[in-house]
């Protein structure tokens, strides 16, 4: 092929998009990477650093993927990553934190496997490739494309366990790709934003998540705090907890980040009762801004592995510049 053609790196990591029923009849397993359909005039190189169902993906795999993308960046114009949907949003956010915004990186997957008549893999893969190669995508950092919608890695989340349009996230998509007789049309509804890049060398620190509920008295807190270098609590509403948690948080020097178990909205420390967000922040808790608990965990993990102090961590979360 002529060297002047656009160069796309297609990275396969497993997931439903690569799955088929196993020969032993025990369910779906990642098998064959999907083919990229209908993309002409593009040089495509394929890579497969691992082939895993996404519940098996760890931050170490995410870092491995980030390193591979950095290696490919000099010889390619864009990167597409196929990934299982269960942890796709976490990998997307990790890449968002750790990769510079310049190289377009798009993640996608499927909710149906290759032997179903409603397989959504080829369409999502083609959409992702066309979005990645679109000039307007440069400078936006890693994105998620699913069902024609384009999502920011910071806000995208899986909102349905089985529906084909499984991804959403407040305040919604930042763009859309549609196919017309004139070719694919990519439209963005938001402009790129400057952001820092975090580049941890290792991921040796440990961060755990606890989930708040009515009547929680801190069960599991002490053990998690002993094992981990930091905690994220999926708190109630705008960042509130039962009163029993207030003295526990006040007693630790380790970072405790408050996200919300609610599906959208920021942490707002406005309540002054025992366990209200204002009292928790006064006791040392760190509001997670608009990040959900599993993304707050990744940001905290990255910051801890960079040697950030608790006040440095508070500053990053509070300013919301990530």
UniProtKB/Swiss-Prot annotation:
GO BP terms: asparagine metabolic process
Q: Name one GO molecular function term.
A: asparaginase activity
**Which cysteine-cysteine pairs are annotated as disulfide bonds in the entry?**
none
Q: Which reaction is recorded as catalysed by this protein?
A: L-asparagine + H2O = L-aspartate + NH4(+)
**InterPro entries noted in UniProt:** AsnASE_II, Asp/glu_Ase-like_sf, Asparaginase/glutaminase-like, Asparaginase/glutaminase_AS1, Asparaginase/glutaminase_AS2, Asparaginase_C, L-asparaginase_C, L-asparaginase_N
Q: What is its EC number?
A: 3.5.1.1
Give the subcellular location: Cytoplasm
Positions annotated to bind substrate: 54, 85-86
Query: Which sites are catalytic?
Result: 16
Q: Where is this region: Disordered?
A: 13-37
Q: Where is the Asparaginase/glutaminase domain?
A: 6-320
Q: Which leading EC class covers this enzyme?
A: hydrolase
UniProt entry keywords in alphabetical sequence: Cytoplasm, Hydrolase
Identify the domain of life.
Answer: Bacteria
Instruction: List membrane-spanning regions.
Output: none
Q: Name one GO cellular component term.
A: cytoplasm
Q: Note one Pfam family from the annotation.
A: Asparaginase_C
Q: What is stated as this protein's family in its record?
A: Belongs to the asparaginase 1 family.
Q: Which PANTHER family match?
A: 60 KDA LYSOPHOSPHOLIPASE, L-ASPARAGINASE
Name of the molecule in the record: Probable L-asparaginase
What organism does the UniProt record list as the source? Deinococcus radiodurans (strain ATCC 13939 / DSM 20539 / JCM 16871 / CCUG 27074 / LMG 4051 / NBRC 15346 / NCIMB 9279 / VKM B-1422 / R1)
* Gene designation per UniProt: ansA
């Amino acid at each position: 092929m002529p060297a002047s053609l656009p160069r796309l790196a297609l990275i396969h990591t497993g997931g439903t998009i690569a799955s088929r029923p196993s020969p032993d009849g025990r369910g779906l397993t990642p098998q064959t990477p999907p083919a990229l359909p209908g993309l002409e005039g593009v040089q495509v190189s394929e890579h497969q650093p691992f082939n895993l169902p996404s519940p098996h993906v760890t931050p170490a795999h995410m870092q491995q993927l980030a390193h591979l993308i950095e290696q490919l960046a000099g010889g390619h114009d864009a990167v597409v990553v196929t990934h299982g949907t269960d942890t796709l949003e976490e990998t997307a956010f990790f890449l968002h934190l750790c990769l510079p915004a310049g190289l377009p990186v798009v993640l996608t997957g499927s909710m149906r496997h290759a032997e179903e008549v409603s397989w959504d893999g080829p369409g999502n893969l083609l959409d992702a490739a066309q979005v990645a190669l679109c000039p307007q995508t440069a400078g936006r950092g890693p994105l998620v494309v699913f069902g024609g919608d384009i999502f920011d890695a910071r806000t995208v989340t899986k909102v349905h366990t089985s529906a084909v349009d499984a991804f959403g996230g407040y305040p919604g998509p930042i763009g859309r790709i549609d196919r017309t007789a004139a070719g694919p049309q990519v439209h963005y509804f938001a402009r790129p934003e400057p952001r820092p890049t975090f580049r941890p060398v290792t991921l040796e620190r440990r961060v755990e998540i606890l989930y708040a509920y009515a009547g929680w008295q801190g069960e599991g807190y002490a053990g998690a705090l002993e094992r981990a270098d930091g905690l994220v609590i999926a708190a109630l509403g705008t960042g509130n907890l039962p009163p029993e948690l207030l003295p526990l948080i006040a007693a630790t020097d380790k970072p405790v980040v408050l996200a919300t178990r609610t599906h959208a909205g920021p942490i707002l420390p406005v309540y002054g009762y025992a366990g209200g967000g204002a009292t928790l922040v006064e006791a040392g808790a760190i509001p997670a801004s608009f990040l959900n608990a599993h993304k707050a965990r990744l940001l905290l993990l990255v910051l801890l592995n960079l040697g950030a102090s608790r006040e440095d961590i508070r500053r990053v979360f509070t300013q919301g510049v990530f």
